[in-house]
Design a protein with these regions (language model features):
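Short proline/glycine- and polar residue-rich coil/turn motifs
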Residues: 114-122
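Intrinsically disordered, low-complexity regulatory regions in eukaryotic proteins
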Residues: 21-91, 99-106, 124, 131, ...
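C-terminal motif of bacterial Sec signal peptides marking the signal peptidase cleavage site
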Residues: 15-19
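Active-site-adjacent structural elements in folded domains
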Residues: 108-113
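Extracellular recognition modules
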Residues: 142-144
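Sec-dependent signal peptide recognition
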Residues: 2-10
Length: 267
């Protein structure tokens, strides 16, 4: 009887160990889950923060960094991170863009594919986002995984989408006013009536004489402080008129506001 008992005990233990081994194999399967993570391109670092998988950006200051009104796309860097074991072969991750309910969808350019190299568990990619076509309106896009065309499966639920929000909204307070109407009230006697296009063109035009964003805004400050002869002097006005002439000569239609009003500067 003792021999039978010992035999049964040994068999039970073997069964238990075998069950544990099978469970481990099931847990670490060949399919890897994937998640979005934050990628800080300036530092080349990743950050797993599922509560902040989003980017918000206002194009307005970019006019001061360019000499034309045709702004380049804004580049958004995004990271991806695998769950589970390292892979001994490269894994293809495909992403796609989806609309966000209630918002105009951004026009974006996505990479053909993202590759997580063998022995790695992270990779990053860039989304090129065009400037919204309408001023002062937020546009959004949702970047998600395209699992039908990827070598991976879904990872953690909270890390399956990345939201990009862009706008081209005038920052009136940087020009020391609260609105376009107040801009015209304060500055039109010196540089003429303005609209959304004109206030942006001023930045790009003055960039041609190496004025940066803050420097251009200082011209408004001088007017506010009662020193109009210090702001928008003959030098700045000559530049604005010259650049406007150059723009109109190089485009099929002269520079105009969305309602068709031509952009002009006083002589």
């Amino acid at each position: 009887m003792k021999t039978i008992f010992n035999y049964m005990t040994i068999m039970a233990l073997l069964f238990t160990f075998t069950g544990c081994e099978e469970e481990e194999v099931m847990t670490f399967g060949e399919e890897r889950g994937v998640n979005f993570v934050i990628y800080e391109a300036a530092y080349g670092t990743y950050k797993d923060d599922y509560k902040n998988l989003e980017t918000e950006y206002n194009f307005f200051k970019e006019y001061a960094n360019n000499t034309t009104m045709e702004l380049p796309p804004y580049q958004v860097s995004i990271g991806v991170q695998l769950e589970g074991e390292f892979s001994d072969k490269p894994l293809k991750v495909k992403v796609k863009a989806e609309p966000v309910e209630g918002y105009e969808q951004l026009a974006v350019e996505l990479p053909e594919e993202v590759i997580v190299e063998a022995g790695e568990y992270r990779a990053n990619f860039t989304v090129a986002c065009a400037r919204p076509s309408v001023y002062n309106e937020e546009c959004k896009v949702k970047i998600v995984f395209d699992y039908d065309n990827s070598d991976v499966i879904a990872g953690t639920k909270e890390r399956q989408e990345y939201i990009i929000t862009l706008k081209d909204e005038a920052i009136w307070e940087d020009m020391y006013v609260a609105s376009l109407e107040e801009w015209n009230e304060m500055y039109s006697p010196y540089i003429g009536t303005a609209g959304e296009v004109k206030v942006r063109f001023i930045y790009t035009a003055l960039k041609n004489i190496n004025y940066h964003y803050a420097w251009t805004n200082s011209l408004y400050y001088y007017i506010i402080m009662g020193r109009p002869t210090w702001g928008f002097t003959a030098t700045e006005m000559d530049c604005l008129r010259t650049q406007l002439e150059a723009y109109n000569a190089s485009h099929d239609a002269p520079l105009a506001e969305p309602d068709g009003t031509l952009v002009t500067f006083p002589n």
